[in-house]
A protein has these predicted regions:
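The canonical Cys-X-X-Cys-His
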Residues: 30-33, 75
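Structural micro-motif
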Residues: 67-76
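N-terminal leader/targeting and pre-domain segments
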Residues: 1-21, 97-105
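Chalcogenol-based redox active-site neighborhoods
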Residues: 35, 66-67, 92-93
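Typically the conserved alpha-helix immediately C-terminal to a functionally engaged Cys/Sec
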Residues: 34-46
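Non-catalytic, surface beta->alpha helical segment in thiol-disulfide oxidoreductase systems
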Residues: 77-105
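Thiol-based oxidoreductase modules, predominantly thioredoxin-like and allied folds used
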Residues: 5-7, 25, 44, 48-62
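Short pre-active-site segment immediately N-terminal to redox-active cysteine/selenocysteine motifs
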Residues: 19, 26-29, 71
Length: 105
């Protein structure tokens, strides 16, 4: 999983201008993020049509505010530069919940 460098929303949308992406918003201190993180390699393998990008909330706080990421862990799907879906809240997310979200896009 690629780790996103610090950038603003406009630069991010340029980066995501072609293809399908899942942005995984997380932070090292977040217990719910640590809960889902071990499942991410398997989720990535099962959804290989997407490129997964890890976004560290603390390194990209302005981007998170601009994108209205109000809780972590959160997932935002982009296709060809446009946001397609989001699973954004402050609740713990299970592997099944993330997979169900991605299956329903």
């Amino acid at each position: 999983m690629e780790k996103l460098a610090k950038m603003d929303k406009k630069a991010l949308e340029e980066k995501l201008s072609t293809g399908k992406y899942v942005l995984f918003f997380t932070a090292d201190w977040c217990p719910d993020c640590r809960f889902i993180k071990p499942a991410m390699p398997e989720i990535e393998a099962n959804f290989s049509q997407f490129e997964f990008i890890l976004v560290n909330r603390d390194e990209n706080i302005d981007l998170c505010q601009e994108m209205m990421i109000m809780g972590i862990p959160s997932f935002v799907v982009y296709e060809d530069g446009k946001e397609k879906a989001r699973f954004v809240n402050k609740d713990r997310k299970t592997k099944k919940e993330v997979e169900d979200f991605l299956n329903n896009i």
